[in-house]
Amino acid sequence: MRFAVGALLACAALGLCLAVPDKTVKWCAVSEHENTKCISFRDHMKTVLPADGPRLACVKKTSYQDCIKAISGGEADAITLDGGWVYDAGLTPNNLKPVAAEFYGSLEHPQTHYLAVAVVKKGTDFQLNQLQGKKSCHTGLGRSAGWIIPIGLLFCNLPEPRKPLEKAVASFFSGSCVPCADPVAFPQLCQLCPGCGCSPTQPFFGYVGAFKCLRDGGGDVAFVKHTTIFEVLPQKADRDQYELLCLDNTRKPVDQYEDCYLARIPSHAVVARNGDGKEDLIWEILKVAQEHFGKGKSKDFQLFGSPLGKDLLFKDSAFGLLRVPPRMDYRLYLGHSYVTAIRNQREGVCPEGSIDSAPVKWCALSHQERAKCDEWSVSSNGQIECESAESTEDCIDKIVNGEADAMSLDGGHAYIAGQCGLVPVMAENYDISSCTNPQSDVFPKGYYAVAVVKASDSSINWNNLKGKKSCHTGVDRTAGWNIPMGLLFSRINHCKFDEFFSQGCAPGYKKNSTLCDLCIGPAKCAPNNREGYNGYTGAFQCLVEKGDVAFVKHQTVLENTNGKNTAAWAKDLKQEDFQLLCPDGTKKPVTEFATCHLAQAPNHVVVSRKEKAARVSTVLTAQKDLFWKGDKDCTGNFCLFRSSTKDLLFRDDTKCLTKLPEGTTYEEYLGAEYLQAVGNIRKCSTSRLLEACTFHKS
């Protein structure tokens, strides 16, 4: 005992008992040449990193797979990988994530990806799902845009057995040009280019060669990258003779590649363990390395180049590195189509039945929504399945990644979903007359975002809200956040809303902030129904019990007063107990929302992935006819637009779902005025998902 006490005193005196954080980043090299460059990298970084900063070390392995295992096990910390290896690194049990991405092009126009597209001649009449029996042109065997992506996406349509893959592809197309394929074993793959020459000197090799195969060699479709046709045909009139095949089995002009591509091919990425604190150290080293040893910075050592060989540690063609947003995992980095293509080829497992008969997997928030979804699933005879998530953004993420298929969102979250590549499919409609006359408008008429106060508070108005207590439906939601905070931002010109209001409840805001002070839980300030003040009714209850102003939809007060809400907090409330704040500084009764509102907002809308949109629309059209025939029929049986608590899965005041015109974009649905409002507050956004989804667009 005496020895233990003495040892502790000695430790304390010497400071040895304090854990010293490990600031060493161990880079993994896969060859002798890479390791030699890594050692030079290490030595040069010593001269430019601060004395108390991170340090670089090198670990040599013999393969990317060994490096991935070493990083996962803590023996190494980082390595740069191409997309296929990023996929492997992200899988369990490796669980690595991208922390930085190489970019190409220039500092002014950094490119972290290119797009794989399918080009066809204008005037032909087939779609992506009708390629069987056509003649195909590929950049080369095993290449991303020309083979991995198109064959991966077509994999489940290939005839069985699908091994060897080349044989299945040869049977699927009536003839092909696949440079580098074996002309003896698979002669049909070389039918359009005898010998399947594997050299850039061959006429049909590579991107330009695959397009020439389409143009001059008898092909029906060419799998290339989005810039290829612009390089070969600089004149628009010439390009207009060609079209792109889209994932949703439509066609678009070749200059609309952003809306019609097979997959995004991401740049090489630096990967690391998820959440052990090394990401910041890795980025600090890379940031300093670029500044001192990037393109054209130093003759002594070049980060993106080496006399020892090609593409050591980083690609020689890289112009620099960008930090990847913290929310981005390997799936968001690679994109759903890329992940699907690789997974199909690696695992060789295809779902039973086609996408046209598959159930729709709905994403539910919280236990209450999941309970309603499960009831819907049982009633739907297998047409609906359920997936759960803790937040709306988590649900959007799951839909993007194919773990779920659809959900209904307010405009603010529909904007985020749109930025993540999802599309609007059907709109909630709150006007029974336009349900019975669906042609009256292309899109259902929107609702009003309003600011509600207590009539007893005579001093409050739109211009003196500073220091008041605010109640919001949730961060990034339309009526409760984007519209009022966008208007506020244009006035105060900063994003410190938690300093503008004295207290508030804004579910989804930073925890321990004053804008979570008024929230009641049980999951305090959570952006779901586990926060009692979440949503329209929750924000109104917050006003009744604690707040000075609530930002909600125009129907909220009407739905919760004059006996329409029998909950203890609402049963005695009267409409005249509340007023609306008008932007001109006046007030009006809650029934005069048409002339006293902050803005008109788009109705909530069902979103899905492009390739799933048609199926979602078909299933929902049948489901709404089965499970909603009006309030009077909504007794005893499952009802789509009725909830045990407020607004589960859909708004309870929904009268029908209106099908949107095919190809409607989120920008078209939300409208220019609303997009401008969201744009105003974009710089204040705390959405990590939005940051991740726009990374490859920046």
Curated annotation (Swiss-Prot):
Which residues of this UniProt protein bind hydrogencarbonate 2? T473, R477, A479, G480
Q: Where is the Transferrin-like domain?
A: 25-347, 360-683
The lineage is: Eukaryota, Metazoa, Chordata, Craniata, Vertebrata
**Family named by the database record:** Belongs to the transferrin family.
**Protein name, as recorded:** Serotransferrin
Q: Which gene encodes it?
A: Tf
What GO terms fall under cellular component here? apical plasma membrane; basal part of cell; basal plasma membrane; basement membrane; cell surface; cell tip; clathrin-coated pit; cytoplasmic vesicle
- Name the InterPro entries on file: Serotransferrin_mammal (IPR030685), Transferrin (IPR016357), Transferrin-like_dom (IPR001156), Transferrin_Fe_BS (IPR018195)
Q: In terms of domain of life, where is this protein from?
A: Eukaryota
Residues with an annotated glycan are N512
GO biological process terms, alphabetically, are: actin filament organization; acute-phase response; antibacterial humoral response; apoptotic process; cellular response to cAMP; cellular response to follicle-stimulating hormone stimulus; cellular response to iron ion; ERK1 and ERK2 cascade
Where does this protein reside within or beyond the cell? Secreted
Signal peptide position in this chain?
Answer: 1-19
* PROSITE patterns attached to this UniProt entry: TRANSFERRIN_LIKE_1, TRANSFERRIN_LIKE_2, TRANSFERRIN_LIKE_3, TRANSFERRIN_LIKE_4
Give the tissue specificity: Expressed by the liver and secreted in plasma.
- Keywords noted in UniProt: Disulfide bond, Glycoprotein, Ion transport, Iron, Iron transport, Metal-binding, Methylation, Phosphoprotein, Repeat, Secreted, Signal, Transport
Q: Which residues carry this modification: Dimethylated arginine?
A: R42
Disulfide bridges in this chain: C28-C67, C38-C58, C137-C213, C156-C350, C177-C193, C180-C196, C190-C198, C246-C260, C363-C395, C373-C386, C420-C693, C435-C656, C471-C542, C495-C684, C505-C519, C516-C525, C582-C596, C634-C639
Q: Which GO terms describe its molecular function?
A: enzyme binding; ferric iron binding; ferrous iron binding; iron chaperone activity; transferrin receptor binding; transmembrane transporter binding
